[in-house]
């Protein structure tokens, strides 16, 4: 669980600028931070604790996990945009933002995460 918490925090930190900068004109900073936390709480535990048990093939797992995160987070952002009537934000913008955020956290997280997991393992 400690490893997951470190990787969850890393994911949030990596996605922070990707979500907050484009949403800044329509969303106050504190609400942006809350949104970021909510998005990751909606997807990250499922990606880490549920989906790996469903797939033996690592490639299939990663593809499904990333698609799941992009779609769910995009739907949440798009739903909020529609509910709050953000004129410049539609479903396509929300999905694009979700894709970009998850691509950053998956790519950079893949590189850094293995090093962190190894480092955390040394502390045990």
Set out the residue ranges of the language-model regions.
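N-terminal signal-anchor/start-transfer transmembrane helix
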Residues: 8-24, 73
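A generic, lipid-embedded transmembrane alpha helix
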Residues: 35-54
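Hydrophobic alpha-helical membrane segments
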Residues: 43-44, 62-81
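Non-cytosolic membrane-interface motifs at loop->transmembrane helix junctions
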Residues: 58-66, 123-124
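Membrane-helix boundary connector in multi-pass membrane proteins
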Residues: 75-97
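Juxtamembrane boundary at the C-terminal end of a transmembrane helix
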Residues: 106-124
């Amino acid at each position: 669980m400690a490893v997951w918490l470190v990787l969850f925090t890393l994911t949030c930190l990596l996605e922070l600028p990707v979500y907050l900068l484009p949403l800044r004109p329509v969303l106050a900073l504190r609400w942006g931070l809350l949104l970021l936390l909510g998005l990751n709480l909606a997807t990250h535990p499922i990606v880490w604790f549920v989906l790996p048990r469903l797939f033996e093939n690592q490639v299939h797992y990663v593809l499904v996990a990333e698609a799941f995160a992009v779609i769910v987070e995009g739907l949440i952002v798009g739903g909020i945009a529609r509910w709050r009537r953000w004129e410049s934000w539609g479903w396509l913008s929300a999905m694009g933002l979700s894709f970009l955020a998850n691509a950053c956290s998956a790519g950079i997280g893949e590189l850094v995460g293995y090093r962190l997991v190894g480092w955390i393992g040394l502390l045990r």
